[in-house]
Amino acid sequence: MGYSKTLAVSLFAVLLLAPAVLASDPDPLQDFCVADLDGKAVSVNGHPCKPMSEAGDDFLFSSKLAKAGNTSTPNGSAVTELDVAEWPGTNTLGVSMNRVDFAPGGTNPPHVHPRATEIGIVMKGELLVGILGSLDSGNKLYSRVVRAGETFLIPRGLMHFQFNVGKTEASMVVSFNSQNPGIVFVPLTLFGSNPPIPTPVLTKALRVEAGVVELLKSKFAAGF
């Protein structure tokens, strides 16, 4: 095959793959597919649909985010999730939301959403929002104090955090372009995994003594 034909075939393949690369969740093929969370069928990129006759009449509405969460936690924050597990009506629609409430000095620790881009608005108070670039972008920290009514954007897969820098309670609402964005809390992943990451791996990676690693593991033995 000549060079021009090879190039044409390659370009055609790229064009075919482009929609899949650009999309997050798969596009729906029906108006509604209320998730059957109790179904026995194997689910791939979504859940089986309930028959509409069994879906009820409230699957498009939720009041779950109307109530503040309890911030009496070790992190001083509370995350109220509204993904497909909590709102089955979002199944196949490629969207979900969270509400996060913060006590003064509370934090939403460094974490990653592996399957979604995040956009958020601060509803009350003021939050330091930090986004960490990847190594090929210089491992740069992008941060700003975001106040009530202001918004922020977090690209898919980048580590980020929020911290209440105000003297009063704060809250934010965020949305994702996935019904199940996933979350990886960095401290819990490193020091509370099951089974644990071997201590020598962490001592070498973090350049600390074994006693420091064991202390940190003890802090996360019970999870968050």
UniProtKB/Swiss-Prot annotation:
Entry similarity comment: Belongs to the germin family.
SUPFAM superfamilies the UniProt entry points to: RmlC-like cupins
GO molecular function, one term: oxalate oxidase activity
Known role: Releases hydrogen peroxide in the apoplast. May play an important role in several aspects of plant growth and defense mechanisms.
Organism name: Hordeum vulgare
Pfam families referenced in this protein's UniProt entry, alphabetically: Cupin_1
Gene induction: By salt stress.
UniProt name for this protein: Oxalate oxidase 2
Signal sequence, renumbered to the chain: 1-23
Binding partners and assembly: Oligomer (believed to be a pentamer but probably hexamer).
Glycosylation sites: N70, N75
EC number from the UniProt entry: 1.2.3.4
